[in-house]
Amino acid sequence: MNIDIVISADHIDEKRLIKKTVIIIDILRATSVITTAINNGCKKVIPVLTVEEAKDIAKNSKEDIILGGERNALKIDGFNFSNSPLEYTKKYVEGKTVVLSTTNGTRAINNSFNAKTILISALINSKATAKAIDKLNEDLIIINSGTNGQFSIDDFICSGYLIDCLYNIRKDLELSDIAKTAHYIYTNNKDIESFVKKATHYSRLKSLNLEKDLEYCFQKDIIGVVPQYKDGYIIKSNI
């Protein structure tokens, strides 16, 4: 199994994704939100690029819609929820459709439409994601959503942890240089939150008093489901 990493949503080459399995990672916080919402019984998540698109879907849909998302880590005016996974509890999302728009994560998802299979991962479900990848048994591209088109330490080290989870299942992994680097960084910094504390996006969230979000997002493997993006929306994968 060949594994490569793309460092941000802006670095996605759509042609490279054809017939590939893709994993989208945005641990702070979009993929943590999506994984949490699906785990708590959300019917589906619709990732969109713009605020206007999200509002149009809510206006025209006959489904029970929750609008969620952020711009520059802040809740969008008129939306029900921000991009905090702690808000997407079973009480509020069970049986409902979440329309989500974020600065980085939903852009990475939508830019990956050419891929054969698209799975959503974060630290909170990495082991479950690794098991799904093993079952698929196909070459893999891990897409880090990044921060405003730039490299993000938090997504990168999460990729390294996901690779480590895969190594615990199988040894026939062929890593690109960047994938080797991510794995090396994780194996030498297994206390991920301590390593990431000086990262730009971490500091931004901390400055907004979102420490509880950070604590939640840096937990490993507290959720056993893997969301899958297909045909414009995200549901619980059956892989």
Swiss-Prot record:
Top-rank taxon of the source lineage equals: Bacteria
Cofactor or coenzyme needed: Mg(2+)
Q: Which reaction does it catalyse?
A: (2R)-O-phospho-3-sulfolactate + H2O = (2R)-3-sulfolactate + phosphate
Q: Which Gene3D superfamilies match?
A: ComB-like (3.90.1560.10)
Pfam families for the chain? 2-ph_phosp
Keyword annotations from UniProtKB, A to Z: Hydrolase, Magnesium
Q: Which InterPro entries match?
A: ComB-like, ComB-like_sf
Q: What GO MF annotations does this protein's record show?
A: 2-phosphosulfolactate phosphatase activity; magnesium ion binding; sulfopyruvate decarboxylase activity
Q: What Enzyme Commission number(s) does the record list for this chain?
A: 3.1.3.71
- What PANTHER family does the entry give? 2-PHOSPHOSULFOLACTATE PHOSPHATASE-RELATED
As for family, the record states:
Belongs to the ComB family.
Which NCBIfam families does the UniProt entry name for this protein? PRK00886.1-1, PRK00886.1-4
State the name under which the record lists this protein. Answer: Probable 2-phosphosulfolactate phosphatase
* Organism name: Clostridium botulinum (strain Loch Maree / Type A3)
Give the gene name: comB
